[in-house]
Amino acid sequence: MCPSEMGTLWYLWSPVLISLAALFSKVTEGRGILESIQRFSLLPTYLPVTYHINNADVSFFLKEANQDIMRNSSLQSRVESFLIYKSRRLPVLNASYGPFSLEQVVPQDLMLPSNPFGFTNTFSLNWRLKAYILQEKVYLSHPKVQVLFHIVGRDWDDHRDENLPCLRVFAFRETQEVRGSCRLGGALGLCVAQLEMLPGWFSPPSVVSGRRRPTEQPEGSPVELYYAVQPGDERGDCAKEDSRKSGGAPAGHNDVDESSPPLHRIGSVFLRETPSSPPLRELRLDSNVAVHYIPKTVRQGDVLTFPISVSRNCTEDRFTLRAKVKKGVSIVGVRASTSSLWDVKQSTEYTGKYAPAVIICQKKSAGSGKSVDDASYEVMKIDIEVEAPSDPPTTQLVTWQVEYPGEITSDLGVSKIYVSQKDLIGVIPLAMEAEILNTAILTGKTVAVPVKVISVEEDGTVQGLSDSVECRSSDEDVVKVSDRCDYVFVNGKEMKGKVNVVVTVTYQHLSSPLEMTVWVPRLPLQIEVSDMELNQIKGWRVPVVSNKRPARDSEEEDDDEKRGRGCTLQYQHAMVRVLTQFVAEAPDPGGHLAHLLGSDWQVDITELITDFMQVEEPRIAKLQGGQILTGQELGMTTIQILSPLSDAILAEKTITVLDEKVTITDLGVQLVTGLSLSLQLSPGSNRAIFATAVAQELLQRPKQEAAISCWVQFSDGSVTPLDIYDEKDFSLMATSLDEKVVSILQDPKFKWPIIAAENEGQGALVKVEMLISESCQKSKRKSVLAVGTASIKVKFGQNDANPNGSESGHLGAGLHVENINDRRSKKPFQEWGSPEGPYYSSSSMGLMEGWGSTTKRPTFPKKEGQENLLDDIILSQTMATDLTSFPDQVDLPGSNVGTEEHDPDQAAKGLSDLEIGMYALLGVFCLAILVFLINCVTFALKYRHKQVPFEEQEGLSHSHDWVGLSNRTELLGNHMNFASSQEEQITAIDRGLDFEESKLLLSSNSQNSINGQLFRSTGAMLTDDKEQKSEPPTSPTSKRKRVTFSTFSAISSDDGCPSGNTMVLSNEDDIKWVCQALDPGECPEPHSCMERLHEHV
């Protein structure tokens, strides 16, 4: 193609190419923003609602691995997970933002999905039912089985009259059963159920024809025990049942009511016809002589026999045994067991009732005992009688000592005789809690659990024990026990946690283990900082605090910036939280580490360790309240968490304050007219609960007001809620773009502007500007840091109880929504049903009269395919809204926004940015092809017969030479920057565009046209060229650019010279539009201009 044709084509195609590049930049811009957020920031965007849990003794907020961005990626909502670990009443979750606050009672079925006490009228969180079998071996002479039940986790100090349930106990053997029952009660919440075994059960199992005879087990015939929980009758008593007594008719399994509560296994007992010899305890005096006895409780008049044995390896032929007793018992006889081997004589040296017994033993021959397999053999037996017991019962002592010829004596040995008028069958230690959460490592405060030791008699009587109780912890590096055995505790000096650590409790000859689980925080703790590199924020000046010196002047700062005395550049802020996992070792060596919630869950413990957090170098960074980190000056330092009990450091995190400056590239704005709160059980854990707070948006009444929520995005990719910055360091100014629809109120009671509804309408009608503090404003210009826009929907006459314009109904599979907005007179809540479980929700209009607004989509775009817990809820609310009932879109200057009223479903669903971009791209391509074809046809028709001679063509200046005389390369290099930062997309002062751009819809720009030429507004003069060149194009911190759409007018000038489809991308001095070959008034139209040019040539 000839050069003249190329110039004409460039003249026609340049607007098309620029629009095409702008469109492509706009389509890919949304995804790039979120990718930058996810890549550089640990903090997702959300509605900055503050959650508080009330009425709970121990509770934590949680973090699930790799789920924060999935659940929190919208300025409209915030999803937070939490755990109610310990509570004596129903907890209440409070959600608040600005003037809005609402509360939601956490239902018990969310905290206890499978609660055995669900039918009771009391709050039973942390309640667990434990069963203790008091006799594992049952004999025909005493065929009773006793089971003690105890509620763990119930507050012993709360003596309210609770409707505790009844327990039914079942014993099964083959096709027969026996039953027993008891009702929980008392301060400890316990009871003892008793069952009497049938006599036939003690005989060997019957042999069924054709089956092998079951082998006899040495421990006896096993019988399985089960229990079921059931409510009591109207008086609180357990229902009567058929008692199975000896000779009673057997009952089968089918007798159990199928509609009754499920059975829970307790364990097994073993039945024997005759009791076996009880095991003897051995008291060894030395390597030769040992005393044996049967540990049991005795009464007045009982005679105890103590067998004395000698080791088979004994080389001594003579020894003397001395036995000394005190008042209350007496030695009544000494009998030789092996008279053929040993001569046993009692000395008469000491006389008297309580005189010590001296027994002289002389070996007769070298023979040994009867069994060569035994290590020792019995020599004699000593009988001791118990006299009148004392009150209270005491323990009698018998002292033993062996003496050999040559005055060689052994150590003293002591046997205890437990004297009591009661027949004790068991001692049970009861703990009020089944677990200990060792937070003492974090706070230095002791965590203790009360313990009570009780005794159970043969008739089922239960009594508390306080004296003569001994206890010992199996591992004091895990848990400790008090001297009086009245509580177990951890004091922060423990080294580990453990599942089912044992504390052994002993009373008289009875002992019993107390098993507990101890959870400890996993060290080192994890410090999570939303931004570990803090920079100065360019253009944001704040007053200098007295103890903080001003930041040094930068070479990039102009005279105006240096003139701001008493102010310094603001540093970025970051949010800090501390996370950990509570873990415990497995009871068996080599087992897997147990987690309180699971390996994917972490517990937020920031509030516990706030007093022990510090910044190593406070001059570099400052920690406010343990949760907000602020840069102070250039340097590197660490956040430390110190141990409250030692000099150890529990966690460290390095943070850096850099000398590089960042700019605010985006201001995300969300309008809030109220809050709604919903609760749902987490699908990943049966103990974690999700709380979802959603901003209500629709303005429904005249003068209804809405609050503002803002996030800022910086050029380094970090995003931060504006709430964490001191409100004295900035101000927000809102402007209504259509005061007929909304107006702006600046109430001094609230730190940010308030938007009020005036008339019906919708669109991006609110512009929000972020300004620096008044004391740091410059005299020449108003320092605006960022500009954002918010969309508004105002529809009057809509039902307050249903802001989305739809009746309550099923939205999706199994999700039932009931919207309740008016919280001025009551605080209702509703239940949402879903396949995952119950869903509870409530909503609030806030504490002010009529707050409201809406934003259709979040300012920060969502990544394609991203999951969100609110997707179903928000989608259902959107689908339920009839967009055709809204008034027409308010036309903004330079924007074309509309809705398809003929298709409500399509309008409600909307087109994604990618779809809009692809359709626009297709249209531009079609238009470009059409223009190209028209240009080719026109050129061929006009100039096929007007070929200029070659020598004349050399002197002909090309069409592009008179279109623009400036250097095209410099023009394109300096002014055709199609990529600008996200900041430049919304901030008018940075690019000097006198228009407001919606963040939700692609819109064209309004520009001033003067004599066919487009000029920049005076705002463009505010852009600092140095700031634009401060970073090289290849810098890793360079920002993603964007293209602004421009419309081109073709208005002829007054003098008749063609203006063409001219476009100016810079100042008017950069390109001079001339027609050197012709007079200005000779060109009525471009084609005649070309013809006259050829004639002149």
Swiss-Prot record:
Residues 1-30 form the signal peptide. Residues 233-263, 885-906, 1021-1042 are annotated as: Disordered. GO terms for cellular component: membrane. Residues 935-1097 are cytoplasmic. Keywords: Membrane, Signal, Transmembrane, Transmembrane helix. It is a single-pass type I membrane protein. InterPro entries: Ig_TMEM132_2nd (IPR055422), Ig_TMEM132_5th (IPR055423), Ig_TMEM132_6th (IPR055424), TMEM132 (IPR026307), TMEM132_3rd (IPR055421), TMEM132_C (IPR031436), TMEM132_M (IPR031437), TMEM132_N (IPR031435). It holds the Pfam family Ig_TMEM132_5th. Residues 233-245 have a biased composition (Basic and acidic residues). Expressed in mature oligodendrocytes in the brain. The keyword Signal applies. It is found in: Membrane. The keyword Signal applies. Residues 31-913 are extracellular. The chain crosses the membrane at residues 914-934. Belongs to the TMEM132 family. Regulates neuronal morphology via inhibition of the WAVE regulatory complex (WCR), a complex that controls F-actin cytoskeletal dynamics. This is Transmembrane protein 132D. It comes from Rattus norvegicus. The gene is Tmem132d.
